[in-house]
Amino acid sequence: DPGDINGLDYIVPLTNTSKAAPTSTQDFNSYLYDIASIDPEVWRSRGVDGDMLAEQFITRVLADQTLDGGFDGYYGYSVATAKEGETVIGQGSVPETISALSALASYRDKENVAAAIEAGLTYLSSVQLADGSFECWGDTPNGAVTLSMLSLMDKLDISIDDERFVKNGNTVADAMRTFYVDGVGFISDFEVEAPLDDLSRLPVYENPVMGNYSTI
């Protein structure tokens, strides 16, 4: 019972809809994840309309969707706090778009959410790199972001061969394989500068698949 874990009630904070205010900068995605994870019967037993609660956070998440279809975590806040006559120009971020769409996935039966997800997927397709991977910031392939895209596709029941996410014959799974290093596992970033005779100074890499840590 999430309402009684070691004497703590983890449901109460989720009902604080003031955190979904237009000028708030909370992690709205996490609220949607948590709301969806609680059995509807639990909400009813607490006299809370889970759907209405989720709708308020959905509205706030959708406010962060930029004109290019992507998501920027501060776009909604910037629009809400802009001075009269001020134009806010937002640009989608790949990691933030994937995160937002993942949070919205459980609510895609709602028409407005489904439309937002489609726009977000169109954005992600447009910024996918030539080898099928995705970047974090800039144009450098990133293993962690590419893996999160694979997870999103699974949540949305999108085939790995969906033509929107195949670039030059490379699927997202093909791209993920390029981040595998023998003896290490999967790494996030190949952008490492170090003398070849001093590999001990290379940073520790996180294996996003196995949860292991190692160095080259």
Predicted regions, residues:
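Structured C-terminal portions of repeat-based eukaryotic scaffold domains
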Residues: V172-T178
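Alpha-helical repeat scaffolds
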Residues: G3-S18, D51-A54, G169
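Alpha-helical scaffold repeats of the Armadillo/HEAT/TPR superfamily
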Residues: D9, F57, G120, V166-V172
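Generic hydrophobic, aliphatic-rich segments that mediate packing or membrane embedding
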Residues: G7-Y10, D27-S30, F57
